[in-house]
């Protein structure tokens, strides 16, 4: 699996996921709309959203755009 992996909105850096990591995810805080920082990468399971966070998970190559 290959996922995007960088904190910017318009990410172009990809990462080959390690064994056991079968999920691509994108996570961000919905309160900070102007200076939005993303956490994007690979995971074994979909990360749990904290209050006011949005988490999106998928399982195909480069799907976490």
UniProtKB/Swiss-Prot annotation:
It holds the Pfam family Toxin_cobra-type. Disulfide bonds join 3-24, 6-11, 17-42, 46-57, 58-63. Keywords: Disulfide bond, Secreted, Toxin. The keyword Transmembrane does not apply. GO terms for molecular function: toxin activity. Gene3D superfamilies: CD59. The keyword Transmembrane does not apply. One of its GO terms (cellular component) is extracellular region. It comes from the Eukaryota. It is found in: Secreted. Expressed by the venom gland. Binds with low affinity to muscular (alpha-1-beta-1-delta-epsilon/CHRNA1-CHRNB1-CHRND-CHRNE) and very low affinity to neuronal (alpha-7/CHRNA7) nicotinic acetylcholine receptor (nAChR). Belongs to the three-finger toxin family. Ancestral subfamily. Orphan group II sub-subfamily. This is Weak neurotoxin 8. It comes from Naja naja (Indian cobra).
């Amino acid at each position: 699996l290959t996922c995007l992996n960088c904190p910017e909105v318009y990410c172009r850096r990809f990462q080959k996921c390690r064994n056991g990591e079968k999920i691509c995810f994108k996570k961000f805080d919905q309160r900070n709309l102007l200076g939005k920082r993303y956490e994007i990468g690979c995971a074994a399971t979909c990360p749990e959203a904290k209050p006011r966070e949005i988490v999106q998970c998928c399982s195909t190559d480069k799907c976490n755009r």
